[in-house]
């Protein structure tokens, strides 16, 4: 956060002022700015992941001012970027923070600490697999002649049709494969032969292979199980999984730092004991 926030702000300012290229796209009457990034959705994803990390750091200490700043981000996204997935995910994150803030306040009045119910814990554990299975299966078996699939494909900006094409051309490999992709990012010129796997689940499964896909899903489960009584971590992981249905940033560690959580130590006392081993006595 110490490094990423200043760099992101500097990139935004440089892009907006013209010091570096600011790619500007149009969707209907809406203007979509990338603010120095390769594409508006990439810029928004970086901001969403940073805010999610900030929420995880602050947790119950998140103030109403901070929540207000998150709302301003949603308005900013809508006005300058038109990034529907990131906007929806940000709104969901805000609602989760407000809900947890209220639940913690009510629990404190009773002299206790809020812990999620067993049902909520189970739901959080199931959601990543449900979302992954839904996106993979609807892409693999997409049929434009089925009305609900056709409408869903339109809602998902043709992600199902492109996923179907990817499965037909490459299919699943154990250790992954090279899949050349052509996206809209990096240029405002019309792209010929657009082919980009936006969904993280389909992207990881086809490009990195079944083994890596299973390992990543297990890592998500490990993070949740290890922090099963930490509602903020559960909420953030679920939100990242929802975001990954439509966007491809799940396995980009410069964006999704949460995948490193299984290797992190959160216990202050444990860390202090570990440091004691390496202290040099005079």
Could you say what each language-model-derived stretch is?
Residues 6-17, 72-80, 128-136, 237-249:
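Aromatic-anchored segments of alpha-helical transmembrane domains
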Residues 7-59, 81-85, 197-204:
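Membrane-interface segments at transmembrane-helix junctions in multi-pass inner-membrane proteins
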Residues 207-241, 266-270, 274:
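Hydrophobic transmembrane alpha-helices and their immediate junctions
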């Amino acid at each position: 956060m110490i490094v990423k926030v200043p760099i992101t702000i500097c990139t935004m300012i440089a892009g907006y002022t013209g010091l570096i290229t600011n790619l500007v796209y149009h969707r209907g009457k809406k203007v979509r700015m990338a603010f120095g990034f390769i594409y508006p959705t990439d810029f928004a994803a970086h901001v969403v992941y940073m805010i999610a990390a900030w929420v995880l750091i602050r947790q119950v200490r998140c103030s109403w001012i901070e929540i207000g700043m998150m709302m301003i981000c949603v308005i900013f996204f809508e006005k300058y970027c038109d990034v529907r997935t990131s906007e929806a995910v940000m709104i969901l994150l805000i609602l989760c923070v407000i809900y947890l803030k209220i639940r913690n306040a009510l629990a404190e009045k009773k002299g206790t600490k809020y812990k999620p119910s067993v049902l909520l814990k189970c739901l959080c554990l199931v959601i990543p697999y449900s979302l992954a299975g839904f996106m993979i299966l609807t892409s693999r078996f997409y049929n434009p002649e089925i009305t609900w699939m056709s409408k869903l494909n339109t809602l998902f900006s043709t992600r199902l049709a492109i996923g179907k094409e990817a499965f037909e051309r490459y299919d699943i490999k154990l250790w992954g494969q090279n899949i050349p992709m052509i996206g809209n990012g990096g240029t405002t010129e019309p792209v010929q032969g657009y082919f980009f796997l936006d969904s993280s689940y389909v992207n990881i499964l086809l490009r990195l292979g079944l083994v890596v896909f299973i390992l990543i899903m297990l890592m998500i489960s490990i993070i949740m199980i290890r922090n099963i009584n930490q509602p903020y971590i559960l909420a953030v992981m679920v939100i990242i999984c929802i975001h990954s249905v439509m966007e491809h940033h799940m396995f980009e560690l410069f964006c999704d730092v949460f995948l490193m959580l299984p290797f992190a130590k959160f216990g202050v006392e444990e860390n202090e004991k570990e440091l004691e081993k390496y202290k040099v006595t005079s």
